[in-house]
A protein has these predicted regions:
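Alpha-helix termini
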Residues: 22, 58-64, 102-104, 249-251, ...
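Active-site neighborhood of HAD-like aspartate-dependent phosphohydrolases
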Residues: 4-74, 90-93
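Conserved phosphoryl-transfer catalytic core
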Residues: 50-185
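Short amphipathic alpha-helix with an adjacent loop that forms part of the alpha/beta core around
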Residues: 383-394
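Acidic, Mg2+-coordinating phosphoryl-transfer loop and its flanking beta/alpha structural elements
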Residues: 274, 328-378
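Substrate-recognition "cap/lid" segment bordering the active-site pocket of phosphatases
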Residues: 223-250, 257-327, 333-344
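Short acidic-hydrophobic, aromatic-tinged amphipathic segments that line or gate anion-handling sites
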Residues: 287, 374-383
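Short, acidic loop-to-helix structural element flanking the phosphoryl-transfer center
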Residues: 18-22, 27, 32, 133-147, ...
Length: 396
């Protein structure tokens, strides 16, 4: 692969520039960014919210604290590598189903029985009611003794690379059928009400309470969460992108040439990017989570718009205006798949992949090379230097 890529040593690591992309990179007239893992380090917010949500559901149901270590980050990253898990609600949901099917049969039976007697609309009321019927249904040392087994099951399942939430759900149902517990799993699926709107949808309510915290949650939903959380995990986010980088890119490309195509909500993006948002063209910003809330949180309605479908990238490019060569900067499989899908509609997109905040750097670099990314860079802050180099300005 070395001939296909020219390498450039930078302070933060090595950049790879695809040899046949030089001319296209030189003529770039816009750059559109993904947020998480590119502009914002969201590992301590989104990843943590997935784990806390699953922990909350199972600790409440079983009356036994589920250690966070039972839900390995590796399982989350494995699902994301497939390219079909752009919404962390999906990841949370799948992990919850896998855990449920691996709990002892007697507990699953007790849950099914309890669930039949519950008809509460509101997710957290349902959870409380189920919990009240399930005390002492699981040995008190269950998670202590079986935590390692559950963790391994999650890693194994996610390594099987289900392509999206629906594929994962089918696999889990099939395996539950083999184990003879499919009816219990169906009761659990119904209990989570994942295809319903808030406040019925348990995953969205619990996840968003942990992620946003009470104040932003209320701003988003218009009602208060019944789950008491002091501060949202969004407060733990850190910026990756610097103002210096955005300034340099604006100078290179001109005013209004930077856009966003992200799965985030505008609320979460504003909260963390703050004033830096002013560097982006307001017409060229697409927030898929906003669209999801507008559609009442409905999974089936949002599916045609979600990455790797090209909607957000095409829409952001159209918002920027007259563009002939657009670089999309992402950090995952779904980002490059989206670029590829957008090119089948309008052949104007190049992909740049950022790898430095990945836990498996070499794996992701290989993934991007295999996807023929135009650029592979440590972080977004290396972009001005690499673009300068390609344009023949070998910045010091």
């Amino acid at each position: 692969l070395s001939k296909e890529y020219q390498e450039l040593n930078l302070k933060g690591g090595r950049a790879y520039i695809r040899s046949d992309s030089f001319e296209k990179i030189k003529s770039l007239d816009a750059i559109i960014f993904d947020c998480d893992g590119v502009l914002i380090d969201a590992r301590r917010s989104y990843d943590e919210a997935i784990r806390r949500s699953v922990q909350h559901i199972f600790t409440t149901l079983t009356h036994i604290p589920l250690p966070l270590s039972t839900i390995p980050k590796e399982a989350i990253y494995n699902l994301r590598l497939s390219g079909g898990f752009n919404f962390d609600w999906d990841t949370t949901y799948v992990i919850a189903l896998v855990l449920f099917t691996n709990l002892p049969k007697p507990f699953q039976e007790a849950f099914s029985e309890a669930a039949k007697q519950i008809d509460r609309e509101e997710a957290l009321e349902r959870l409380a009611e189920a919990s009240s019927k399930l005390n002492n249904k699981l040995p008190k040392d269950y998670f202590e003794k079986n935590g390692k087994m559950l963790k391994e099951v999650l890693i194994r399942f996610t390594q099987s690379n289900p392509e999206d939430r629906e594929a994962a759900e089918r696999l889990i149902l099939k395996s539950a059928e083999r184990e003879g517990c499919v009816e219990h799993l169906k009761a659990f699926i119904e209990f989570l009400a994942y295809n319903s709107e808030a406040p019925r949808n348990m995953i969205s309510i619990i996840f968003d309470t942990y992620f946003y915290g009470p104040k932003l949650f209320k701003e988003l939903y218009g009602f208060e969460s019944r789950l008491r959380v002091r501060k949202g995990l969004i407060e733990k986010e850190k910026l990756i992108v610097t103002e210096e980088t955005l300034k340099a890119l604006k100078e290179m490309l001109g005013e209004g040439r930077l856009g966003l195509a992200t799965g985030r909500s505008s609320l979460a993006t504003k909260k963390t990017l703050g004033d830096l948002l002013s560097y982006f063209n307001s017409q060229g910003m697409v927030f898929l989570e906003d669209l999801k809330y507008k559609m009442g949180g409905s999974e089936s309605l949002i599916k045609p718009y979600v990455k790797p479908q090209p909607y957000s990238l095409l829409e952001a490019a159209a918002g920027i205006g007259d563009v002939n060569s657009v670089l999309y900067v992402g950090n995952s499989a779904e980002d490059y798949l989206m670029t590829k899908n957008a090119n089948s509609v309008k052949r104007i997109f190049l992909f740049a992949g950022c790898y430095a905040i990945h836990n498996t750097r070499s794996k992701i670099i290989e993934l991007f090379k295999g996807a023929e990314a135009a650029l592979i860079i440590p972080t977004v802050n290396d972009l001005p230097k690499v673009l300068g180099y390609v344009r023949g300005v070998r910045g010091g």
